[in-house]
Amino acid sequence: MSDGTQKLWGGRFTGETDPLMHLYNASLPYDYKMYKADLEGTKVYTAGLQKLGLLTETELAKIHEGLAEIKKEWDADKFVRHPNDEDIHTANERRLGELIGRDIAGKVHTGRSRNDQVVTDLRIYCRDIVNDTLFPALKGLVEVLIKRAEGEIDVLMPGYTHLQRAQPIRWSHWLSSYATYFTEDYKRLGQILHRLNQSPLGAGALAGHPYGIDREFLAEGLGFNSVIGNSLVAVSDRDFIVELMFWGTLFMNHISRFAEDLIIYCTAEFGFIQLSDAYSTGSSLMPQKKNADSLELLRGKSGRVFGDLTGFLMSLKGIPSTYDKDMQEDKEPLFDCLTTVEHSMLIATGVISTLTVNKEKMEAALTMDMLATDLADYLVRKGVPFRETHHISGECVATAERLGLSGIDKLTLEQYQKIDSRFGQDLFETFNFEQSVERRDATGGTAKSAVLKQLDNLKSQLN
């Protein structure tokens, strides 16, 4: 007897499948993760068949009992896989036949193709991961950033451009910046969820369902928002996977930059923060080392997720319309992307919630040259055009450097007035870091009131 008789597609074949081809073709080693979605889809699909009169109520009840038993086996990690189980669909159908008999189990696939079955499973799986895993994990990360920002609102630090000290900011302003990035990711994920939550079930292999199944009934039963209106698109569309993976790459780009900042801040040269032991590792040779491996892995794994997306895009770009086996290559990069993103969220949350801030070192890193813009603003308030004040302030910086002074605050009033006569005694009030940040109180700025408004706004967006 040919092994083809054990396959869903075996009737046309008389020869044996090459053993390597069987392994090459099989996807159960990774698509088993969709077992819940597959069983759920079959449960609703068979209800649709019963509604058409293609199954009796008794048959439907037996099928649903069998599906429930299979779910228990998977949940308990007791499902026995067979060598001929090609994928999660064939494994579940084979086991259903063992439990309730092949005569009834053989009706389950009536009018359904693995083409619409697998993409239905994928959409359910992605939806569940977004709702049950990604949303809570990302919200938790943002909430930790907000909580920390509120608690350390009075800590000042240098803000950087080009990795050069630029202007004083609040540490909470930095925390709020990444809370903002991640909140945008949170909202973007909701938009993707709306688009992916459409039902392809009932589209058949490509041409549609031969028995006129109620696709709206199937969609409602599976919690989809709508039905994909073209059967060719229904079975072939993988844009929702591309979009979800692109979302993952964008999030990982944000988390990589977040990690890079913290890696810099925790070096001995900066000393702004110290990671907890829970998120650090040591050296096998140098006993004194405390390495920020959690952050370095966040940065490094971003490249992995980028590769998942680009690899799948290369698989997808040249295939003809409707279903092709190339599409089997969607699952491994998708699963890897989603798992990596989830773990990265949890690690980042742990890092930020347990690190220690060295307020003294942050504030000691503030230097008076960072107030050069404030000096220019001082003259603006006296009616001098900003482009002129920018040049004057730059001349003050150059003069202090030429005289070997430690900062522009060390120039005397006489020296200032030689540069520009409009400087007055009150210019020295400019040299105050707290006042500098408090002047920047417009929406989005680093003043305390502005940062607190940012945090309140982020909270409202999460809710």
Curated annotation (Swiss-Prot):
Active site: 162 (proton acceptor), 283 (proton donor)
Record-annotated membrane-spanning stretches: none
Catalytic activity: 2-(N(omega)-L-arginino)succinate = fumarate + L-arginine
One BP term from GO: arginine biosynthetic process via ornithine
Alphabetical list of InterPro entries matching this protein: Arg_succ_lyase_C, Argininosuccinate_lyase, Fumarase/histidase_N, Fumarate_lyase_CS, Fumarate_lyase_fam, Fumarate_lyase_N, L-Aspartase-like
Entry keywords, A to Z: Amino-acid biosynthesis, Arginine biosynthesis, Lyase, Phosphoprotein
Site for Increases basicity of active site His, residues: 296
Record's keyword annotation contains Lyase: yes
Entry-linked SUPFAM superfamilies: L-aspartase-like (SSF48557)
Amino acids binding 2-(N(omega)-L-arginino)succinate: 27, 115, 161, 291, 323, 328, 331
Enzyme Commission no: 4.3.2.1
Pathway where this protein functions: Amino-acid biosynthesis; L-arginine biosynthesis; L-arginine from L-ornithine and carbamoyl phosphate: step 3/3
GO molecular function, one term: argininosuccinate lyase activity
A Pfam family that the UniProt record links to this protein: ASL_C2
Modified residues (Phosphoserine): 27
This protein's GO CC annotations: cytosol
Further remark: Present with 10200 molecules/cell in log phase SD medium.
PANTHER family recorded: ARGININOSUCCINATE LYASE (PTHR43814:SF1)
HAMAP family assigned to the protein according to its UniProt record, in alphabetical order: Arg_succ_lyase
Quaternary structure annotation from Swiss-Prot or TrEMBL: Homotetramer.
Family of this protein: Belongs to the lyase 1 family. Argininosuccinate lyase subfamily.
Protein's recorded name: Argininosuccinate lyase
